Structure formats: structure tokens, C-alpha cells
A protein has these predicted regions:
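Conserved alpha-helix/loop element of class I SAM-dependent methyltransferases that forms part
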Residues: 18-38, 48-52
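Class I SAM-dependent methyltransferase SAM/SAH-binding core
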Residues: 40-95
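A short acidic, Gly/Pro-enriched loop at the edge of an enzyme's catalytic core
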Residues: 93-105
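A short SAM/SAH-binding and catalytic strip from SAM-dependent methyltransferases
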Residues: 103-116
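A short glycine-rich, Lys/Arg-flanked "PGG" loop and its adjoining helix->strand segment in the class I
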Residues: 118-130
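Conserved beta-strand signature within the Rossmann-like core of class I S-adenosyl-L-methionine
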Residues: 131-139
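Short alpha-helix
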Residues: 164-179
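Core SAM-dependent methyltransferase catalytic element
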Residues: 185-207
Length: 207
């Protein structure tokens, strides 16, 4: 009961604050305007990315979000958006996505929480149209062993408090393993962010 209350009422606010930090918002502001056509946003959350889409370039956003608490918090944001936003209340691993149906798939600060990221990413690749793009920005495993060691130590405690967030996943490796071809990538520590959660990988990939 307490766990359910935490996940429904407390966690969405905590994640909204963390994912809305200035250094994270800067990453979003650089990535999201590149989206075009029919868009699938994986882990839509509280709708933080909406402010950065260019409505003139997109036709629809399908918002994949299994959390009822997140969807409820995002509702007022969606209400004022000029492009249709359609909810898909499922996880990325189980969602029935039509093959080759999206021009852009957006993955921002979500891969860390997906229970089976390999299965999810394989499904996303099939849902991307030929010539489409996967836009991603994710935190993950640091290249410095001292930081990585602390990530491994802290992760078991961190995960239940942070909605299942893993600190030790390698976003680029997961994306490549799923069959995507990364066409552009940049990585490094975000400023004014604890290094255990601040190693960021962002870029674009094709199916």
C-alpha cells in the first residue's frame, strides 16, 4: 500500500523535478526539435519534452507511458499542445507497435528504467520507418572505473527509490545491440550533476 502510494503520488513529482533540472533541459532543448513526422515518445512521463517539439514539423505524438501517476500529471500539459497526443498506456516491451509506423522515436532518460531494454529496443527498431530516426539522450555507466564502482555499489539502493532507474546501463551499447546504427553521438559528464548519475550519452540512430 505504501509502495503504491509512493509510486503513484510521490515518485512522479520527484522524477519530474530531477528530469527538469537545467542541465537535463539543455540536453532536451538540443535534441527534441529534431523530431519530425509521426513521433513515438517512449516514457513520456510528465510531458517535459513537449516544450521543445516544433509543432510545424510533427503530425502526432504517441505517448508511451505505463505509469498512471505520470499520465495524470502530464494531462494539463497535453491539453494545451497544438498537435494531437495519443496515450499508449503500456511498457515499451509489451506495446503492440505497428511495424514501420513512426518517423521519429524519442528516448530521453527512460532506458534506465525499462525492465527489459533489449526487448524494448528491438521492438522500437521494428516500429521505425525506413529512413526514420531514433533520438536519444540517456545517463548511464561512467567510463571512469572509480565512478563506475560507486555506481555499482549504490544502484541496489537507488533503484527502488528512483522508479527502477539503473545507474550502470550503457545506452550506446544497448542501442547498437538492438540493431540500430548510431549516426551521431556525443558523451560526457553533465555539469553540476553528481557523476554517478551524470554521464550522459546523446545522439541519433537509424534502424
Amino acid at each position: 500500500m505504501i509502495s503504491q502510494l509512493y509510486e503513484t503520488h510521490v515518485l512522479p513529482h520527484l522524477i519530474g523535478c530531477a528530469c527538469g533540472a537545467p542541465q537535463i533541459m539543455k540536453q532536451r532543448s538540443r535534441l527534441i526539435p529534431q523530431a519530425s513526422g509521426r513521433v513515438l515518445e517512449v516514457g513520456f512521463g510528465t510531458g517535459t519534452n513537449l516544450a521543445f517539439y516544433d509543432p510545424a514539423k510533427i503530425t502526432e505524438i504517441v505517448a508511451l507511458e505505463p505509469s498512471e501517476g505520470m499520465r495524470r500529471k502530464a494531462a494539463p500539459v497535453i491539453a494545451g499542445f497544438p498537435v494531437p497526443v495519443t496515450w499508449l498506456a503500456e511498457g515499451a516491451e509489451t506495446a503492440a507497435l505497428e511495424p514501420q509506423s513512426f518517423d521519429t522515436i524519442v528516448l530521453t532518460y527512460t532506458a534506465c528504467t525499462i525492465p527489459d531494454p533489449d526487448r524494448a529496443l528491438a521492438s522500437l527498431r521494428k516500429a521505425l520507418k525506413p529512413g526514420g530516426q531514433l533520438l536519444f539522450s540517456e545517463h548511464g555507466l561512467a567510463p571512469d572505473e572509480g565512478v563506475a564502482r560507486w555506481q555499482r555499489r549504490i544502484e541496489p539502493v537507488w533503484k527502488p527509490l528512483a522508479g527502477g532507474c539503473h545507474l550502470t546501463r550503457d545506452p550506446a551499447a544497448m542501442i547498437t545491440r538492438a540493431g540500430f546504427s548510431i549516426t551521431r553521438i556525443e558523451a560526457g559528464y553533465l555539469p553540476k550533476t553528481p557523476k554517478i548519475a551524470g554521464y550522459n550519452t546523446a545522439g541519433c540512430a537509424a534502424a
